[in-house]
Amino acid sequence: EDFVPLLEPLAHQLPNIRGYLLCREAPQEVATSLPLVGEFETLLAEQPSHYDFPSFDENGVATLFYTTGTTGNPKGVFFTHRQLVLHTLGEASTFQAPGFELLNRDKVYMPITPMFHVHAWGVPYTATLLGATQVYPGKYEPEMLVKLLVSEKVDFSHCVPTLLNMVVSAEAI
């Protein structure tokens, strides 16, 4: 819901988007001109317990993210389904190394690296595969991030140095 006011003035530039999915803690109405398809938790609860996934080409494009432009202008990079699965499996084997278990069913994970930044390094996919509880902060406000880290008893997180500096400089610490 935090991004609705940012998306509304841009919606006319996004003609291929047929609807928006709202993600929030509690389902409630949001006043917006955007075509909402629903709220994530409500839609999830309404789904049948079984779903027959359609076949698709593992080499087909699955996602698009943008580089930060470290060596030039930012650019879009496509990832295939196969690349995401192989990355997730490789990362999972590392995160499950004996004596090094960063993520598993008993762990709580909260990314501070946003998904648009290199898929948050792919860790959300790995956390899902390994059954970790996941906490997604929404806005990147330092005090709120610190409160979530503590209140949700986060075991594992990651971020870029700029965000880490914001968090450790927060008044809540």
Model feature map: region roles:
Residues 1-42:
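Structural core segment of the AMP-binding/adenylate-forming
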Residues 1-10, 25-27, 113, 140-143, ...:
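Adenylate-forming
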Residues 46-66, 73, 99-108:
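Conserved pre-ATP/AMP-binding loop-to-beta segment of ANL
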Residues 85-108, 116-156, 169-171:
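Conserved AMP-binding/adenylation subdomain of ANL enzymes
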Residues 40-41, 59, 81-82, 113, ...:
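Structural detector for helix-capping/boundary residues
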Residues 62-90:
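Conserved AMP-binding A3 loop
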